[in-house]
Structure formats: structure tokens, C-alpha cells
Amino acid sequence: MTDVEIKAENGSGDASLEPENLRKIFVGGLTSNTTDDLMREFYSQFGEITDIIVMRDPTTKRSRGFGFVTFSGKTEVDAAMKQRPHIIDGKTVDPKRAVPRDDKNRSESNVSTKRLYVSGVREDHTEDMLTEYFTKYGTVTKSEIILDKATQKPRGFGFVTFDDHDSVDQCVLQKSHMVNGHRCDVRKGLSKDEMSKAQMNRDRETRGGRSRDGQRGGYNGGGGGGGGWGGPAQRGGPGAYGGPGGGGQGGYGGDYGGGWGQQGGGGQGGWGGPQQQQGGGGWGQQGGGGQGGWGGPQQQQQGGWGGPQQGGGGGGWGGQGQQQGGWGGQSGAQQWAHAQGGNRNY
């Protein structure tokens, strides 16, 4: 894919043709009394506003604590994000770039993080190249390419850490990036604590009633399953955040079905947690012979983030096997080295 094709796909070009998601911000942390007029009064200082709404409880008509502001161009959004913190109705609120509905099939979209996950990393990519490229979105504090422990070659993904979560949001909205002549796709690189927060957000949004256009959920609605941290799963191959498994396993949501709440076939993992032949992974999803999810039953064992392994390794969050596992379940006692601050080659 060429730079021109990347720009066309990402909606770059004339401000009048900019996609709405590049011109919209989500504003959380509003008081129950915040009105559209109060939001407009504050955000009009950054430029022309084309639409504004405070999401309200259908019964009480009071603010549900968040809303959206759409500007006439992306430059107004940039100006607003540079002038944080924002104080509306006497309270510091939480503005961030809005995620379009067609991308909103992952609850983590509304969780802020300073770390960016980068897929499509090739052997001719270096950490310095990642730093040089992504510096245009903000100050990069760290870049790392994840290597295979045996071959010392890139496993196809890496991470870039910024000093501000808004830099990550800008990169995610851009979708695809050309780094050293190769297309790289990005998403938020959430920690397990941030993933837990994302799930709580998802649960809260599900209970929050309908949005203005009738879609269930709060922050632009909810959605289905995610992709894989480290690319598609291979039968018998290594997992993303975990050791090798027997049958098939996935990365963050897996490749043999889907992520949160989506049904899958065969075997699959959650956070890179490999599975043996049967059993579901992900958050509450079903597949094969058992259910995964947060503590869901799996072959008469408790499942974790992606469920337990059939062998000696236990599950992740809440998962138990014969031994305690790591993130999503790992073989034996080996845990994800990066999470422990150890060797980066995993």
C-alpha cells in the first residue's frame, strides 16, 4: 500500500472532507447537571462546533456523565486537546478523541493509555525507526520490538510509549501507518489493569440505556471481538502473551473466533493464553468444548483471561490449573518476562 492509498483510507486531506471521527471528541466526567449549552459555551473557544450532545438518562433526563462535541475540522480538536485540563460546570472533565462506531468493537477504545501496540513489524524495522516515525504524534519515551527468544527475530509486533495518551489516540484514529516502506497497523497497548477497567466500562455502558440514535451502550455503543496481539494464531505455534500450546491458540481475543462475547470454534486463547484442542477463550466467549471468560468453567477447571491450559499451566485472572499461570495462562511456571521487567525476548 502506498502513502497515497494510506491517506485515502485514513481520510486525510481537505478539512471539509475530513471524517466525522477526526473532528469529534468524547467528554467524560460531566456532572449530572451539565447541559448542552454549558458544553457549547466552553468548547466554542476552540473553533466552530457543528454538533454537541450531553447523553442523558432516558428516565430522569439528567446527564449520564458524558457527551460528544463535533467541530468543523480536525485542527479544532487538536487545539482543544492541547489546552487540557478542561473545566466545565466547576469540574475537571476527561476529553479524548472519539472512536468511530465501526471501530468500536473493543471496550478498551474508551480507556486511556500511553502505550501503543504496533503490528506488521518486519525484520528490517528497528526501534529507532519506530521512534522516528511516531514522534510526529507526540513525545516518544520508549520503543520496543518484541523478539522471538529462539531466533532473536521480530515476532511481528512491538510497542511505542508516549508521554501523553492523546498521542496514542491520534495514532489509533490514523489506523494504518507506513514505517520504512511497510504497512503497520496499531491499537492501544493496554495493561491487564487497563483491560479490567475496559471491561468495567463495557459493563457500565451496557447498563446505561440507549444513546441518541438508539444504539445500546454509552460511549458510541459496544461491539464484538478483537484481533490478536502479535498477529493471527497458528495451530501449535506460539501465543502472543504466553507460551506455546497444543491445539490452536490466539492472541488478545484470538483468531479462532473472536474476543469479548463472540463465539468461536476450535481452540483459542485470550491474552495469548494457549489452549489445548478444545475450550473457549476470550471474555465470556464460547468455543469448542467449554466456556472461557472471567472464571468461566473450562474442562472442569476455572478459566481466566482466555481460559486455562489442559496441561500443567493454570489460567490467568481467576483461572486455576495444577499450577498458577500468568497473563491468560502460560505453560508451567514461565510468565511473560516483560511484565516482570526481565528479558524482553519472549
UniProtKB/Swiss-Prot annotation:
Location of the RRM domain: 23-123, 114-191
Alphabetical GO biological process terms: hemidesmosome assembly; mRNA splicing, via spliceosome
Start and end residues of each stretch annotated as Disordered: 92-111, 189-346
Biased composition (Gly residues): 216-296, 303-331
Domain of life, source organism: Eukaryota
SS bonds (residue pairs): none
UniProt keyword list: Chromosome, Nucleus, Repeat, Ribonucleoprotein, RNA-binding, Telomere
Ranges of biased composition (kind: Basic and acidic residues): 92-107, 189-215
GO molecular-function term, one example from the UniProt record: RNA binding
UniProt xrefs under InterPro entries: Nucleotide-bd_a/b_plait_sf, RBD_domain_sf, RRM_dom
Compositional bias annotation for Low complexity: 332-346
Protein localization: Nucleus; Chromosome, Telomere
GO cellular component: catalytic step 2 spliceosome; chromosome, telomeric region
Primary site of residence: nucleus
Keyword flag Iron: no
The keyword Ribonucleoprotein appears for this protein: yes
Function: This protein is a component of ribonucleosomes. Overexpression gradually increases telomere length, leading to increase lifespan.
Protein name: Heterogeneous nuclear ribonucleoprotein A1
Species this chain originates from: Caenorhabditis elegans
